[in-house]
C-alpha cells in the first residue's frame, strides 16, 4: 500500500497487482498492522515527525530521509541503523536499502524499536520528562 495525502491523484499511474495506491486515510493504525515497512521520503518541514514516531511505536522497519529522521536518528541504536532503520536521501540510497532488506526476511515488529519508542517518545515518557522538570525546578516531589 502507498498511503499519503494527495497520492490519490496518481493512483491510476502507479496502481497495479503489487502496488496499491490508497492516498489519504483518516487513521493509519489498520495499515501499520499489515505493513512490512514504512517509507517516509520527506524533503522539508519543521521539527520531529509524528509519522516517524508512530512507525517506531509499531516496531516497523523504517526508510526515511534525513528530514523524516530529524531528532530520531541520533537515538536509534547503532546496531539497528542500516538493518531496521535506514537513512536515505537519494534514489541510490533507497535502492541500496531495498537491496539490503531483500537479503533476509523482514521482521514486521521489531521489539527494540518499540522499547525505544516507549522509553523516549511515548505519552508515559513525556510525562516522566515533565515530572522531572517540575521536580527539579520547584523542589517538589510529585
What are these regions (language model features)?
Residues 82-107, 138:
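C-terminal "capping" alpha-helix adjacent to the active site of nucleotide-linked donor transferases
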Residues 103-142:
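A charged, aromatic-enriched C-terminal amphipathic alpha-helix characteristic of glycosyltransferases
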Residues 1-5, 62-65:
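Short, hydrophobic beta-strand segments that form beta-sheet elements in well-ordered domains
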Residues 51-54, 61-68:
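Short hydrophobic beta-strand element within catalytic cores of glycosyltransferases
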Residues 27, 44-47, 69:
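Active-site donor-sugar recognition loop in glycosyltransferases
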Residues 66-82:
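Short acidic/histidine- and often glycine-rich active-site loop of Leloir-type glycosyltransferases
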Residues 4-30, 80-84:
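Nucleotide-activated donor-binding/catalytic signature segment of Leloir-type glycosyltransferases, i.e.
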Residues 33-47, 58-60:
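Acidic donor-binding loop of glycosyltransferase active sites
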Amino acid at each position: 500500500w502507498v498511503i499519503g495525502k494527495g497520492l490519490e491523484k496518481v493512483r491510476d499511474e502507479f496502481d497495479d497487482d503489487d502496488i496499491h495506491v490508497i492516498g489519504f486515510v483518516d487513521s493509519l493504525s489498520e495499515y501499520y498492522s499489515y505493513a512490512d515497512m514504512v517509507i517516509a521520503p520527506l524533503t522539508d518541514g519543521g521539527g520531529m515527525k509524528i509519522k516517524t514516531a508512530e512507525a517506531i511505536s509499531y516496531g516497523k522497519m523504517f526508510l526515511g530521509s534525513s528530514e523524516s529522521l530529524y531528532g530520531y536518528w541520533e537515538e536509534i541504536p547503532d546496531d539497528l541503523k542500516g538493518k531496521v532503520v535506514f537513512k536515505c536521501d537519494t534514489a541510490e540510497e533507497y535502492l541500496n536499502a531495498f537491496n539490503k532488506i531483500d537479503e533476509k526476511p523482514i521482521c514486521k515488529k521489531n521489539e527494540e524499536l518499540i522499547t525505544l519508542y516507549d522509553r523516549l517518545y511515548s505519552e508515559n515518557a513525556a510525562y516522566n520528562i515533565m515530572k522531572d522538570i517540575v521536580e527539579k525546578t520547584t523542589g517538589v516531589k510529585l
